UniProtKB/Swiss-Prot annotation:
Keywords: ATP-binding, Ligase, Nucleotide-binding, Protein biosynthesis. Allows the formation of correctly charged Gln-tRNA(Gln) through the transamidation of misacylated Glu-tRNA(Gln) in organisms which lack glutaminyl-tRNA synthetase. The reaction takes place in the presence of glutamine and ATP through an activated gamma-phospho-Glu-tRNA(Gln). Heterotrimer of A, B and C subunits. Belongs to the amidase family. GatA subfamily. It catalyses: L-glutamyl-tRNA(Gln) + L-glutamine + ATP + H2O = L-glutaminyl-tRNA(Gln) + L-glutamate + ADP + phosphate + H(+). The keyword Membrane does not apply. Its EC number is 6.3.5.7. The keyword Magnesium does not apply. Pfam families: Amidase (PF01425). One of its GO terms (cellular component) is glutamyl-tRNA(Gln) amidotransferase complex. It comes from Chlamydia trachomatis serovar D (strain ATCC VR-885 / DSM 19411 / UW-3/Cx). This is Glutamyl-tRNA(Gln) amidotransferase subunit A.
Length: 491
């Protein structure tokens, strides 16, 4: 059953080949048998999920119509609210916080009869790229348990890679869906800013965050987006970008002009560079034309991103003070000491580091030097992408400079920040991007290529990703590090 895509599972439900209860029980058995080694989940909603599965089976038995996601098990990153379920953001600060309402994406998934399995591990408050910054436990890469799965949506990527669920929700602030997707050999889609509601997502960077799906195949990205994309009155940043469905769009003619910023590829590990150019060759054989585009301004993307993201994080996380929300210290002599102790005890080192950086760049003495200049460069970066899209339909870039790194190779914070060089610009410019598996490194680790489009061209980007998937002959990648999970290799 784990070899079936979400779309295939739904077809099996519709055709009465499988019951929703049987599917749900099967995937819980996989999680309970193997997740101890991987650590993808923080909590499970088993009783809730099986009750919903039974109700959907009853609907089928009565001949009632069922939703788009009927019978599909879905994991949810633990910064997205499900009513009555803990939302910890993988932080001691929110260790006991129970969500009082559903996020819009969760509400729409359940309206379409999706089955929510549980909450997935992440870097604390989505700040990190290894899932080693979780306050509770690390998540391991199913391809090599001594390597990181990426982050911050590392639990989501690992869960899909291990086939604990065919779809997982992640959030992408600077690459947090696409980078772990590439590290774990799955598909990751970062929608345009405003394409998916952020209502019920715990905010990190409010002008950067987007919720998106991680899946095994591009068709399931389209299915998920059809279920939960679109305007939401509870999120004023959402827009109606799309005509028709994502699933229908996959069969339309693929854009043929692909831009590549070749001057921005020098930092790639050699086998990653070879793999990227092999991916371009696949698209050329399919009929695309590859041209060079000038995106030299991208060299400023990482520092600008960490200025903007840290400033927004410092503002958003100010609410976690031990009074209104979050952990409160056991003893303090006065209110100011209570604030300080509660935040010191509740936040981990990486979150603290970014709050300090954000407060620094927003301080009266430094705001003009850092934050305002950073926003000016962000505007230049947006202009550079717009100029590039006047010459091409889609931009292709690597996702990561290297395959997944080992625990002992986890770098100092600044070096880890520089790993985001190929992903953060997409968020700064509000663009959609999809990461699709592109093969294996010389060490047998998965690699990914990303396709980037203009804001609102999400369906077109999925078309390109689907075309690459079909022509690359890499339909699904199966990891082999966990005994009994599956055989390993490419299918």
């Amino acid at each position: 059953m784990y070899r079936k895509s979400a779309l295939e599972l739904r077809d099996a439900v519709v055709n009465r080949e499988l019951s929703v209860t049987a599917i749900t029980e099967y995937f819980y058995h996989r999680i309970e048998s193997h997740d101890e080694q991987i650590g993808a989940f923080l909590s499970l909603c088993k009783e809730r999920a099986l009750l919903r599965a039974s109700r959907i089976d009853d609907k089928l038995a009565k001949g009632d119509p069922i939703g788009l996601l009927a019978g599909i098990p879905i994991g949810v990153k633990d910064n997205i609210h499900i009513t009555g379920v803990k939302t910890t953001c993988a932080s001691k600060m929110l260790e006991n916080f129970v969500a009082p309402f559903d996020s819009t994406v969760v509400r729409r998934i359940e309206m379409e009869d999706g089955i929510l399995l549980g909450k997935l591990n992440m870097d604390e408050f989505a700040m990190g790229s290894t899932t080693r910054y979780s306050a509770f436990h690390p998540t391991n890469n199913p391809w090599d348990l001594e390597r990181v799965p990426g982050g911050s949506s590392g639990g989501s990527a690992a869960a899909v890679s291990a086939r604990f669920c065919p779809i997982a929700l992640g959030s992408d602030t600077g690459g947090s869906i696409r980078q772990p997707a590439a590290f774990c050999g799955v598909v990751g889609f970062k929608p345009s800013y405003g394409a998916v509601s952020r209502y019920g997502l715990v905010a990190f960077g409010s002008s950067l965050d987007q919720i998106g799906p991680l899946t095994t195949v591009v068709e399931d990205v389209a299915l998920a987006m059809d279920a939960f994309a679109g305007r939401d009155p509870k999120d004023s940043t959402t827009r109606d970008f799309f005509k028709g469905t994502f699933s229908q769009a996959l069969s339309l003619e693929v854009p043929k002009l692909i831009g590549v910023p070749r001057g921005f590829l020098d930092g790639l590990q050699e086998d990653c560079k070879e793999n990227f150019f092999e991916a371009l060759a696949v698209m050329e054989r399919e009929g695309s034309r590859i041209i060079d585009v000038d995106l030299s301004v991208l060299k400023h993307a990482v520092p600008v991103y960490y200025i903007v993201a840290s400033a927004e994080a410092a503002t958003n996380l100010a609410r976690f003070d031990g009074v209104r929300y979050g952990h409160r210290c056991a003893q303090a002599d006065n209110m100011h000491e209570m604030y300080a102790r509660s935040r010191k005890e509740g936040f981990g080192k990486e979150v603290t580091r970014r709050i300090l950086l954000g407060n620094y760049v927003l301080s009266a003495e430094r705001q003009n030097i850092f934050y305002k200049k950073g926003m000016a460069v962000r505007a230049r970066l947006i202009d550079a992408f717009q100029a590039a899209f006047e010459r091409c339909d889609v931009i292709a870039m690597p996702v990561c400079a290297t395959p997944a790194i080992r625990d002992q190779d986890v770098l100092d914070p600044v070096s880890l920040y520089l790993q985001d060089v190929y992903t953060v610009a997409v968020n700064l410019a509000y663009l959609p991007a999809i990461s699709v598996p592109s093969g294996l490194s010389k060490e047998g680790l998965p690699l990914g290529v990303q396709f980037i489009g203009e804001r609102g061209s999400d369906q077109q980007i999925c078309q390109v990703g689907y075309s690459f998937q079909e022509h690359s002959q890499i339909k699904q990648l199966y990891p082999k590090a966990v005994n009994g999970l599956f055989d390993g290799g490419i299918e």
